[in-house]
Amino acid sequence: MAPKVRAAKKGEKRVGKAKSGTAETAKRRRGKRKESYAIYIYKVLKQVHPDTGISSKAMGIMNSFVNDIFERIAVESSRLSLYNKKATISSREIQTAIRLLLPGELAKHAVSEGTKAVTKYTSSK
């Protein structure tokens, strides 16, 4: 026969399993994280002008600018891969998209910096 279990009276300590979820409810839930290029923009700023700061409003504008350029390059390179009936966007499509999107000297510098970055990445593997 099973032993009898009596209910705890008011004021008595309860012995047994702790309530599940108490540790989870004690922790505060974080909101969804916002992805941003802010830390990278700041690192580049410090490389170029170590003594210069940036306001949060200016950082927001720079972040929007980077997102916009990134999207334009992605759309243009996607369009180029469709024209060439290719399923994959390669560095060639990215390079051509940059040449089409950016004017003159800026495009040349962007292509050379991009090539340098890709070479550095592939050699480090």
From Swiss-Prot:
The keyword Nucleus applies. The keyword Ion transport does not apply. Transmembrane segments: none annotated. InterPro entries: Histone-fold, Histone_H2A/H2B/H3, Histone_H2B, HISTONE_H2B_site. It is found in: Nucleus; Chromosome. Glycans are attached at residue 112. Gene3D superfamilies: Histone, subunit A. CDD domains: HFD_H2B (cd22910). There is a cross-link at residue 120 (Glycyl lysine isopeptide (Lys-Gly) (interchain with G-Cter in ubiquitin)). GO terms for molecular function: DNA binding; protein heterodimerization activity; structural constituent of chromatin. GO terms for cellular component: nucleosome; nucleus. Residues 1-32 are annotated as: Disordered. Keywords: Chromosome, DNA-binding, Glycoprotein, Isopeptide bond, Nucleosome core, Nucleus, Ubl conjugation. Pfam families: Histone. Monoubiquitination of Lys-120 gives a specific tag for epigenetic transcriptional activation and is also prerequisite for histone H3 'Lys-4' and 'Lys-79' methylation. It comes from the Eukaryota. The nucleosome is a histone octamer containing two molecules each of H2A, H2B, H3 and H4 assembled in one H3-H4 heterotetramer and two H2A-H2B heterodimers. The octamer wraps approximately 147 bp of DNA. Core component of nucleosome. Nucleosomes wrap and compact DNA into chromatin, limiting DNA accessibility to the cellular machineries which require DNA as a template. Histones thereby play a central role in transcription regulation, DNA repair, DNA replication and chromosomal stability. DNA accessibility is regulated via a complex set of post-translational modifications of histones, also called histone code, and nucleosome remodeling. Belongs to the histone H2B family. This is Histone H2B. It comes from Acropora formosa.
